[in-house]
């Protein structure tokens, strides 16, 4: 993460749950500086990819959310995501809970279109 911090030119404060290995890197950026938010988002995505690469996962107790949803395919293949969407169909058939906050938008839209066409 320190190397990525240098690469992206943004400072990061690493906060962890010492007992279970959860990381909460706090990337510091200036919202008033053009391009800093986009750089911060790219930096965050690289941290998540690195986590998966070394055997971790995209998220822990805080869920996926809009920040991580389009990176779900970094950790899960198409069949895994389809199985997860099938479970969502069972427990949330109208997809009202956490709408557009769990699955990559492209995959979720295709799944929902197929589901609605079948109704």
Residue positions per predicted region:
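Conserved glycine-rich FAD pyrophosphate-binding loop
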Residues: 1-119
